[in-house]
Amino acid sequence: MTVFSLRKHTAVDFVRGGEHILLADTALMADESTVDYSLKGAWSKRNLSFHPQVIGFDDDYTNNYLSKKSNLISFNGMLLALWDDAYQFSDSLNYRLPVDFLLVREKQKPDVQSVVNGYDVKMLIVDGSVPRYLAEKWINQAKAIGLPYYNIGDGAMEVGCTFK
């Protein structure tokens, strides 16, 4: 899984062997120069197709190694949750959903406490679509409670997987 370092856009590539599925916003896919420069270069280095299957943030999708339902994505044993305008956690649940990664995207008001009230998060990822001043607030709040984090503004994040 690769979370690309892109300004104003979100792109997560789920790679298995020579196949890959790209989770991306429609604005990114319409931005040919960003796709050519930022995505195709990475795909070329990994000998991946320049034409992956693309799924949107509002789409549900399932195949033999990836499942996306609403804001949750299961990829070969890892669980990723999205935190954006469309998806946040319901306060009505009486348990914390365990997730490996929680990806904050778009202009979300920094509220790490709400995140940890709803999710048992191993790592918070602050995406490049989050404005810099908000990203700094998310990171400072994560530091304050000892929550591991990664700021995509520092570069792409690649997580290896062991395929079973």
Task: Please report, for each region that a protein language model flagged, where it lies by residue.
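Hydrophobic alpha-helical transmembrane segments in integral membrane proteins
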Residues: M1-A11, G17
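Extracytosolic and intramembrane catalytic regions of membrane-associated proteins
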Residues: D13-K164
